Curated annotation (Swiss-Prot):
Its EC number is 3.5.1.18. Belongs to the peptidase M20A family. DapE subfamily. The active site is at D68, E133 (proton acceptor). InterPro entries: ArgE/DapE_CS (IPR001261), Bact_exopeptidase_dim_dom (IPR036264), DapE_proteobac (IPR005941), Peptidase_M20 (IPR002933), Peptidase_M20_dimer (IPR011650), Peptidase_M20A (IPR050072). Catalyzes the hydrolysis of N-succinyl-L,L-diaminopimelic acid (SDAP), forming succinate and LL-2,6-diaminopimelate (DAP), an intermediate involved in the bacterial biosynthesis of lysine and meso-diaminopimelic acid, an essential component of bacterial cell walls. This is Succinyl-diaminopimelate desuccinylase. The keyword RNA-binding does not apply. It holds the Pfam family Peptidase_M20.
């Protein structure tokens, strides 16, 4: 298939950029962007490659994304090697095809076409690209945003190319995301022999009622923009592996995906009150991964909705569900942030794939968004 979007997507997929490694993906993008007049600034931190690129001045529309991918798993389960992209029955197969090298290719080709049609565009077109979104996300977008904010860079609109769609391209657009906070809880007891429980203090038994209450609690009811806050236990560990030893400690890790009805501070307070009420001897550490954010209807949302309607004749559903994305960092700059990308049915799975026609369509949507906001 001779199509610049598909050809670039295949070139990117061929590079096994397991997070946080980039494996030359960004160099490929930078070469294309500099050829059409972009200024590119490498902003590497630690083991992570990032770049910030821009062309023009004025109101800024940035396209954000990541070149890293998750591991492929057992490659023998794939119908075709994950880093040897192939098109079969109109589908482009390969690790990162949907998440999110297909989007990156669509963005770059959209920029090339936009600049060719509008060489003297009025606003500023920018790219914020990282190689660490799938793993720790410590040295990626968050560090670039910190650096840009420190020098008072302006960002008005940001389109994140995460795979947002469900059935057809653009049927779902993410105009916000829930916050995420994780608790690492340790319940302290006293180790002993299972035959002499009166000489020990079993932290599993002590914690069970509190954990049941954590699970049963309605944290909030959500609102017009966010579903209710959820709490899920992710890991539990106790014991020595022996069937005759009462454990001395219980480790429980649980995560909240929270709406704007709550704050991370309120969550921590409510959990502490619950644990104290059950008279547990515990220590707890919290890790905040991101605050919730929301982009209300405005110029960016309207431009995205218009582009999707124009090319796919569907009205996007604006949702805030799902996992976190780097949009949570970019929103700190005061920018309107929206996620629009391909269908997410196969992301992180064996035989990850995306419709080649969908990527072509997505690139046209991206171009139309550019034309509406900064032409």
């Amino acid at each position: 298939m001779s199509c610049p979007v598909i050809e670039l997507a295949q070139q990117l997929i061929k590079r096994p950029s397991l997070s946080p490694n980039d494996e030359g993906c960004q160099a490929l993008m930078i070469e294309r962007l500099t050829a059409i007049g972009f200024t590119v600034e490498a902003m590497d931190f630690g083991d992570t490659q990032n770049f910030w690129a821009w062309r023009g001045t004025g109101k800024t529309l940035a396209f954000a994304g990541h070149t890293d991918v998750v591991p492929s798993g057992d490659e023998s389960h794939w119908q075709h090697p994950p880093f040897e992209p192939i098109i079969r029955d109109g589908m482009l197969y390969g690790r990162g095809a949907a998440d999110m090298k297909g989007s990156l290719a669509a963005m770059v080709i959209a920029a090339e076409r936009f600049v060719a049609a509008h060489p003297n565009h009025q606003g500023r077109l920018a790219f914020l690209i990282t190689s660490d979104e799938e793993a720790s996300a410590v040295n990626g977008t968050v560090k670039v945003v910190d650096a840009l904010m420190a020098r008072n860079e302006r960002l008005d609109y940001c389109l994140v190319g995460e795979p947002s769609s469900t059935h057809v391209v653009g049927d779902v657009v993410k105009n916000g995301r829930r916050g995420s906070i994780t608790a690492n809880l340790r319940i302290h007891g006293m180790q002993g022999h299972v035959a002499y429980p009166h000489l020990a203090d079993n932290p599993v038994h002590r914690a069970a009622p509190a954990l049941n209450e954590l699970i049963a609690t309605e944290w909030d009811r959500g609102n017009d923009f966010f579903p209710p806050t959820t709490m899920q236990i992710a890991n539990i560990q106790a014991g020595t592996g022996s069937n005759n030893v009462i454990p001395g400690e219980l480790f429980v890790q649980f995560n909240f995906r929270f709406s704007t009805e709550l704050t991370d501070v309120l969550i921590q307070q409510r959990v502490a009150e619950l644990l104290d009420r059950h008279q547990l001897n515990y220590t707890i550490d919290w890790k905040l991964s991101g605050q919730p954010f929301l982009t209300a209807r405005g110029e960016l949302v309207d431009a995205v909705v218009n582009a999707v309607k124009h090319y796919n004749e569907v009205t996007p559903e604006l949702l805030t569900n799902g996992g976190t994305s780097d949009g949570r960092f970019i929103a700190r700059m005061g920018a309107q942030v929206v996620e629009l990308g391909p269908i997410n049915a196969t992301i992180h799975k064996v035989d990850e794939c995306v419709s080649a026609a969908d990527l072509q369509l997505l690139s046209r949507m991206y171009q139309r968004i550019m034309e509406q906001l900064i032409a």
